[in-house]
From Swiss-Prot:
Gene Ontology cellular component annotations, sorted alphabetically: cytosolic large ribosomal subunit
Superkingdom per UniProt: Bacteria
Gene3D superfamilies per UniProt: Ribosomal protein L11, C-terminal domain, Ribosomal protein L11/L12, N-terminal domain
GO biological process, one term: translation
Subunit structure: Part of the ribosomal stalk of the 50S ribosomal subunit. Interacts with L10 and the large rRNA to form the base of the stalk. L10 forms an elongated spine to which L12 dimers bind in a sequential fashion forming a multimeric L10(L12)X complex.
Keyword Ribonucleoprotein attributed: yes
SUPFAM superfamilies, A to Z: Ribosomal L11/L12e N-terminal domain (SSF54747), Ribosomal protein L11, C-terminal domain (SSF46906)
The protein's name in its UniProt record: Large ribosomal subunit protein uL11
UniProt similarity note: Belongs to the universal ribosomal protein uL11 family.
Keywords: Methylation, Ribonucleoprotein, Ribosomal protein, RNA-binding, rRNA-binding
């Protein structure tokens, strides 16, 4: 007889700095209400994201009825990657009037390749268009 499947009781999506998860908000309250061992998650997440320190890494936590959990880390948000590559703190308050930085086509392609597993795109060209659109909406000019 095959083992019984665990019943899923919750799906939590968070964006946490890599290697810096701690029981303080937003992690503690989100996991606490599902009865998950918060420190166990923090240690596992910090170990899994140690190599990406400094970046914000989205995580999808699946909670089961026996209070156990599994989590999947995603690629950093496209907006954060664009800010990092452009070397700016934040996007433009008026993106269609005020441009704050420039990205080359090669930089956009590099970001698209990094984000490809999480993007809803069939090929790299479609992914580049998605990233370029995000950049434009932040007031970042894409050259090339």
């Amino acid at each position: 007889m095959p083992p019984k499947k665990k019943k899923v009781t919750g799906l939590i999506k968070l964006q946490i700095k890599a290697g810096a998860a701690n029981p303080a908000p937003p992690v503690g309250p989100a996991l606490g209400q599902h009865g998950v061992n918060i420190m166990e998650f923090c240690k596992a997440y910090n170990a899994a994201t140690e190599s990406q320190r400094g970046m914000v890494v989205p995580v999808e936590i699946t909670v089961y009825d026996d209070r156990s959990f599994t989590f999947i880390t995603k690629t950093p948000p496209a907006a954060r990657l664009i800010l990092k590559h452009a070397g700016i703190e934040k996007g433009s308050g008026e993106p269609h009037k005020t441009k704050v930085a420039k990205l080359t086509a090669a930089q956009v392609k590099e970001i698209a390749e990094l984000k490809m597993p999480d993007l809803n795109a069939n090929d790299i060209d479609a992914a580049v268009k998605i990233i370029a659109g995000t950049a434009r909406s932040m007031g970042v000019t894409v050259e090339g």
